[in-house]
Amino acid sequence: MEMGSDGEDQKIRSVVGDANLNNKKKKIDNNSSSKDGRVKPKRQMKTPFQLETLEKVYSEEKYPSEATRAELSEKLDLSDRQLQMWFCHRRLKDKKDGQSNKPVKSSVAAVQSASVNELPAAAGSVPEQDSRSDSGSESGCSPYSNSRRNFASGSSSSRAELDEYETMGKPSYESRLSTMVHRAIVCIEAQLGEPLRDDGPILGMEFDPLPPGAFGTPIAMQKHLLHPYESDLYERHDPRPRRSHAAARSFHEQQSLDDPSSFTPNMYERYSENHARGMDYEVARSRISSFMHANGPVPRSYVTPGHASRNCSTSQQDMPSPIESAHHGDRFLLEKDSSVLGTEDPYLLPDGVRKSSDVHRKGKINDGRLGRGSETRENHGPKDLEKLEIQRKKNEERMRKEMERNERERRKEEERLMRERIKEEERLQREQRREVERREKFLQRENERAEKKKQKDEIRREKDAIRRKLAIEKATARRIAKESMDLIEDEQLELMELAAISKGLPSVLQLDHDTLQNLEVYRDSLSTFPPKSLQLKMPFAISPWKDSDETVGNLLMVWRFLISFSDVLDLWPFTLDEFIQAFHDYDSRLLGEIHVTLLRSIIRDVEDVARTPFSGIGNNQYTTANPEGGHPQIVEGAYAWGFDIRSWKKHLNPLTWPEILRQLALSAGFGPKLKKKHSRLTNTGDKDEAKGCEDVISTIRNGTAAESAFASMREKGLLAPRKSRHRLTPGTVKFAAFHVLSLEGSKGLTVLELADKIQKSGLRDLTTSKTPEASISVALTRDVKLFERIAPSTYCVRAPYVKDPKDGEAILADARKKIRAFENGFTGPEDVNDLERDEDFEIDIDEDPEVDDLATLASASKSAVLGEANVLSGKGVDTMFCDVKADVKSELEKEFSSPPPSTMKSIVPQHSERHKNTVVGGVDAVIDESNQGQSWIQGLTEGDYCHLSVEERLNALVALVGIANEGNSIRTGLEDRMEAANALKKQMWAEAQLDNSCMRDVLKLDLQNLASSKTESTIGLPIIQSSTRERDSFDRDPSQLLDETKPLEDLSNDLHKSSAERALINQDANISQENYASKRSRSQLKSYIGHKAEEVYPYRSLPLGQDRRHNRYWHFAVSVSKSDPCSRLLFVELHDGKWLLIDSEEAFDILVASLDMRGIRESHLRIMLQKIEGSFKENACKDIKLARNPFLTEKSVVNHSPTDSVSPSSSAISGSNSDSMETSTSIRVDLGRNDTENKNLSKRFHDFQRWMWTETYSSLPSCARKYGKKRSELLATCDACVASYLSEYTFCSSCHQRLDVVDSSEILDSGLAVSPLPFGVRLLKPLLVFLEASVPDEALESFWTEDQRKKWGFRLNTSSSPGELLQVLTSLESAIKKESLSSNFMSAKELLGAANAEADDQGSVDVLPWIPKTVSAVALRLSELDASIIYVKPEKPEVIPEDENEQISLFPRDSPFKGKGPREQEDQDEVAPNPGNRNKKRARVSLGSGSNRKVKRKKAQSGLNKFVVGRRNVAVNSNLMAVELNHQVPGKGKRTVRKRPERIDEDNSHLVNRMANIVRPKSEEVEEDEEEEEQTFRDINEDWAAGETPREMEEDWANETPNRMMTPMQVDDESDNSVGVESEDEDGGGQFVDYSQRNKWGLDWNSNLNVAIEEDEEEEVVGVGRVEGEDDAEMSESSEDDDVPANNAANNYDRESEGYSSSDS
C-alpha cells in the first residue's frame, strides 16, 4: 500500500479504512443474507463483564488449563466449549492484529487497559445481545475497540480526558490527533455558545426522534419526517465482516482520504449505519429503554435503520473512531439530521438556528478535511483535481434532486393526510346527526307509550272501582247471610238493633247496605251495660281497698299469680279472704311463707344462670340458660350496693327474710338510686374487673357486664313476649303489614297498595318475592286476631291496634330499629318453628275465648312477659298484672337508663362484706336522696315488716312477684303449660269433631221421621230474631234459654257421652234449633275447649268472659268448695278500671238474662256463667242465711301487736262502707271490733310466734349447733313466754311461771301475751346466748374474761330493742380473734377501725351505720357471724385440685369480701367436728349440713374418687361407713330427668330406708337407734385423731390455689330446689332431677353401691362429726341450711322442695 509523506497520517488512514471496510462488508453481508431469505442462527453475545473477565484471564494465561476453564465456566455461566472457542479466536485475533498494526496496537493498548479498568461493575447485568457475527471474539477484542469506547463514553467529550488520551500516543501521532480533536471541539462550542459538558453525550451522537406530540409538535407532522417510503430503512443489516475485509481495506482507506465524496451516502446505503455503530452500546441501550419505559415498546418508525437492525447487537469493534467521524463532515450530516432521522434535540436551540449552525459546522469540517486531503493531493495533477471537482458537482446535483423529490413526496403526504382528516370529521358529524335524530324518535315513542299506559291505568282503575263496589255489595250480602248463622260482634249487633228500631224494621236482616255502613251514627244512643237493674256492689268496705281500684287490682293479681303457680313455688293453697286478712294482721305467717318462697325462687333463678354457661346469641330465650331469667340487674345492683347473694341463700329463714327483701329491692332498683359524683350510675366493670370474680353470671363469663347484658338483651328482644301465638317477628311480611296498616285506621288498604307502602317504608324488601301480594294475603288471612278483611283484597288492623297517623314516622323508624336489632343479634329457629306450628293449629282451633281477649293494646308485648295473668284492671292499656309490670319495668329502666339528680351522702348503706376503705359501687358512689324510692323500702330500713302499712305490704309483694315472674322458674313452667294446653286443645277438638259426626249420622235418621210434621220453611229459619222477640226471651226463666241451646250444651258439657245418648236428648228438638246450634256451635265450642284446656294448664289468667262493653267478669276461687267464700263472688272489672262485685243470686240471674246469645263475647260469657251457676247460687244462698253485721265502721289504726294492750281490737287498718254504692259484706276482715275478732287475731298471732320459735330457735345459729362445743349459757329462756332471764332464777320474770313445772313442748298463749318485749327481740336473745356459749375458748380474745362475759350477758338481758342487740352482737364480734374468723367476714372493728369499735364506760360500742336497727337485720348479721366462726381447727389435708365445673361464683369483680384463698373458709356447713380418739380403722363417710337439701360441697378431684362433706345427723350403719360418694360432674346447665332404679340388694334397700328415716317425724324408732348412732359416730370420731379435719384441708387447699375464686353458690339444699325435681310422693319413688344425679342425702343413685363399698375399703378417712343428740338432729333436719318454713297444714316444707318436673308443671 502506497503511503504519503506523513507516516502518522498513513497510520490513521489505515485505521479508518479498516473500519470502513468492515462496516461495508457487514452491510453487504446483511443484504445478501436477507435476499437469500436464509436467517442465520442467533449467537449469544457475551456481556461486558464476561469479556472483561476473559480478557484479564487471557492477559495472564493465553492457554488456560482445564481447572481454570472450569472455574471460569462456573463464574461466567459459559460452557467449556464456548471458553475454548473464545480463547482460540482471541489468539487468532492477536496474531492477525500483531502482524498488521503493531505500532498502533502498542499505543492503544495503554488506553485499552485504562478503559477496561474503568468498566462499571454492573456491566454483567446488561441484557444479552443479538449478534450475527461468526465469531464471538470479534466483539471487544480489537485494539481500537476500547479506545473507541473511551471516546464514546459520556465523559470522553471533556478536554481533560482528551488531553489524557493524547498523552498516551507518540509525539508525532499525538500532535495531529490533538489538533483534529481541538478543532472539532472548538467548532461545536462556537455553535453552542458555551463549553461542552463533561457529562454530556458523545460528539456526533444521533438522538432518537421525539415521541408524537412532544413539546407541542403536531402528530401528523412528526410522522412524515421519518421518510416511510425508503424500504432500505427497515432492511436487516448483517454486521459480520467478510473474509475479503483485510484485502479490501487498503482500497477503502485510500478512497476515504483521496475522495471525500465517496463518503456521501445515498438513501439506500447510508452513512448513519456506520456512524450508529460508533455509539456506545450502553448509551444507545439506555436511550431506547428509557423511551420504552415511558411510552411502551419502541415503534420501528422511531428507530434509525442502524438501530432497527443493531440496537441490541452493535459491537464495539464496529464503532468508528472520532478521527473517522471528522472526515465525514459534508452535507450528509445536515441531510441526515433533518430528513432521515427526523429527530430534534430538545436541549438545543430552535430549529432554524440549529440547522444553520449545523450547516456552518459541517462546512468547516469539510473544509478541514479538504485542507488535510490537499496535502496528499499536491502530488496529483490538474486532471485529477478536475475529475474530483466534476465528481463533487455530480454528487451535489444528485443530492439536490433527491432532496427535491423528498420534499414533493412530503407535500403529497401532507395533502393526503389533510384530506383524510377532513373526511373523518365529516363522517363523525353525519354519525352525530343520526344519533340525535334516533334519540328524538326514541323519546317521542316513549312519551306516546307512557301516555297510552296512563290512559289504560285510568280505565283499569275505573273498572276496579266498579268491580270493588260490586264485590263489597256482594260481600255485604254474604256477610249478612253468614251472620244469620254465625255470631256477630256484640257492639255491632247492638248498633244494628238500634238502626232497625229507628227505621221501624222488624229484624236486622232487613237493613240495607248503606245503613250497615253508617252504623256509627247510632253509637250515641247506646245504653249503659251492665244494666242499672243489675245492682253491683263495692267489693270492700275498708281502706285501702275501697280507696283505690288499682290497689284492688294489684291484690287480685298477686293472689291469682300465687295460686296459679303454687306448685312451682311450693305454696299451700289459700283463699282470697285469708290472703286479705294476712295484710291486716300484725305479723302473718302466710305472708312470711309467701315472701320466703318468692325470695328462694329468685335466688334459684340467679343460681341457675350462674351455673349454666351462656353460649351466646343463638340460645333459645326460653331455656334456663336465658341470662335475663337470671335477673342480671339484681346481680348488678347487689354488687353495686355491696350485698352478697350467697349470704341471702344461706341465711334465708323466717327471721331474716325482711332484711333480705330490703337488700333485694335496693339491688333491683326500687329504692334510692346509687350514682357517682359526676352523675354517672355505678358500673360493676369499673377498672377493677380483673381483680374481682370471674363468674358473676354467665353474661359476665362471656366478657360483658351485667348492665350491658341487660341492655343488649332488652334491645335484641329477650324481654319480648314469651312465645305469643300472635307475635310479630321483625323482618317478616306480617310485621311490616301490621305497622303500615296500624296507621291507616279502619279504612284499610288493598293488597296492592299495602305492598307499595311496605316497599316504600323499608320494612320489607318485596322485590325478592315473585308474588308479594300473595304472601301478604296469606300472612294477613291466617291471623284474624290482628287483621280483619273489610273487602275483597282489602285489610285493616283491628280497632285496639290502630295508631295515630301523626306518629307514623316515629313508629316506622322504631320498627326499622327493631328489624336491625333482630338481624344483628337474635335468632331463634325453634321459636319460628313453634310459631308456624301454632299458626297451623290456629286454622282449626280458635284457642282464645274472644277476639279482644288476647291483648287489647299495642302494649300487649310487655304484658306477655309476665305470662300468667291477663289484665286485671279494665283499662285497655293495662294487661296481665294491672300496670304492676309496667311499674316494675319503668323502675328498672329508670335505674339503668336515666341517672338521678346529683346528691351526696356521707354514709352509704354498706354491709359488712365491704372493706372499710371501699364505698358502694366504687370510691365515688353516693346515694341520691332526692329519690328515696318506694316507701316500703324506707319502712324496712327504719323498722320491722310488722310496722308497714297494708298498702306498703301490698306494694312490696307486687314488686317481688314482678321480679319472680321474670325468672326462668316461672318461664319454664309457663312453657310446659302452654305446650300441654295446646296439645289438650287439639285432642278435645278431635274428639268433639268425631262425636259431632256421629251425632249428625244419628240425627239424619231421626229427621226423616220428623220431616212429615215439620214444614220446609222452618229449615232455613234465620237465627237472628227481631229485637222484640229477643227482649221477650230475656224476661223468661234462664232455664228456658238453656233449652234452646241444648245441643250445644250437651256437646260442650260432656264430650264423652255416647252419640246415642245425645241423639235421644235431641230427638224432640226443633229442626230450626238444631240447624242453629249446629251452625254456631263450632265457634262456641272452640272457645269452650280453649277455656277448659287453660283451666287444666293455666299459663295466663283468663276472665270468665267479656260483655258488649268489654267489661270483664272474674271468678277468683281456688275450688268450687262451699268453704271458699270467693266461690259465691263474681268480680266485675269495668272498662274504666273500676272493680265491682256480684254476690247475690238475683244479680246473677239478671246478668245472664241481659246477655245476647248472638254476640261473640256475650255468647261465650253466658256459657261460662252457666258452668258456675250451680255452685255460685248454692254458696250465695248459704251466705244469706249467715247472720252478719250489715255495715262496719272505719277505724283508722296503725298496725301493732295484739299483745301490746289488753284489748287487741286495734290490730290493723279498718274500713267503712261506701257512700256512693252499697258495699258487699261477703269478704270479712277481722279488725278487732269485737271479742270474736280479737280472739281470732290473738290466735293467729300466737300461731305465728310458735311457728317462728319452731323454725328459728331450734336451728339457729346453725353452725354453732352443729360444731360448737357448748359452754354454760349466761341466760336461760322460758319455754312458756320465750323470755330470757338469769340462769340462777327459778321463776320467769315475765310470765312468773315456775321453771321446773313448765311444759317445754309447747309455748303457752298466755305466756306470749304477757311479755312487754317484741317477739323478735325475745327470740334474738337466746340465739345470741347460744352463739356466745358455742364460741371456742381459743377463739376469744384475752380480754374476754368471765367478768367481761357476765357484763355482756347482763347487757343482753337488759336490751329491749334491735339497736341494743346490735351493739351486744358487735361487742361479741370484737371479742373473737381474727384468725378464728373466715377471711371473707369483715368485723365491725376492721370496717370502722379499732379505736371506734372499743366499748366506752357504759358498754356501748359503735356499730356499722349501714345495718338497719331491725330484728331481721340483726338476725342476718348474727347468722353471718355464726357461719364465719371456725369452731374446729382443721388439719392439713392432701392437696387435691378442685373440680372446675363446680365453680359458680357470684362475687363482684372487686368485691372486698373475697378472702386470701378462694376456699380458705367455706360455709360453716363444711366444718368438721372435734376430733375424737384415734382408731386404726378408717372409712369414708358423707359429712355436711343437717338440712334436707344438701350442699354439693367442694369436691377434691383425685382420679375418679371425690369426697364431699355430708350431714352429721345421718343415722348410718356399718355398711354406710364404707360408701364412697362418687357423683358425676354436672352437665352445663342441662336438666337430666332419670328414674331411680329399683334396688333389690338388701344392703342398698336398708341404706335407703335408713336415709328415709331422717326426714320422718320423731318417733320411737329414732329413740331406739339413738344409742347405736352415737356409738357409730363415736367410733368414727376416734379416727379423726389420726387424720385431718376438713377445715384444715380447706385452708391448705385455699393456700395452694390463692388465685381461684371461692364458689359462693354450691349446689346445696336450696340450689337443688332450683334445679332438681322431686315427685309429689314423699316416699322418694318419683322422678328426681339433679345436675349430678344425686339424691338429697348426697348419694349417687346411678352408681353401683357394692363396687363403691369395695373401693372405699382402702380410702383414707375424711372424718365425721360428733352428734349432739337426736333432738337437735331432728330440729336441724327441717330448717338448718335451707331455712324452709315448715308448713304443718300442707306439709310442704317437711319434705325437700326441689322444683317440679315437666309433668308436675
Swiss-Prot record:
HTH HARE-type domain span: 731-800
Alphabetical UniProt keywords: DNA-binding, Flowering, Homeobox, Nucleus, Transcription, Transcription regulation
DNA-binding region: 39-98
SUPFAM superfamilies associated with the record: Homeodomain-like
Cellular component annotations (GO), alphabetically ordered: ISWI-type complex
GO BP term (any one): flower development
Matches recorded under InterPro entries: Asxl_HARE-HTH (IPR007759), DDT_dom (IPR018501), HD (IPR001356), Homeodomain-like_sf (IPR009057), RLT1-3 (IPR044977), WHIM1_dom (IPR028942), WHIM2_dom (IPR028941)
Subunit architecture: Interacts with CHR11 and CHR17. Interacts (via the DDT domain) with CHR11 (via C-terminus).
UniProt name for this protein: Homeobox-DDT domain protein RLT1
Species the sequence originates in: Arabidopsis thaliana (Mouse-ear cress)
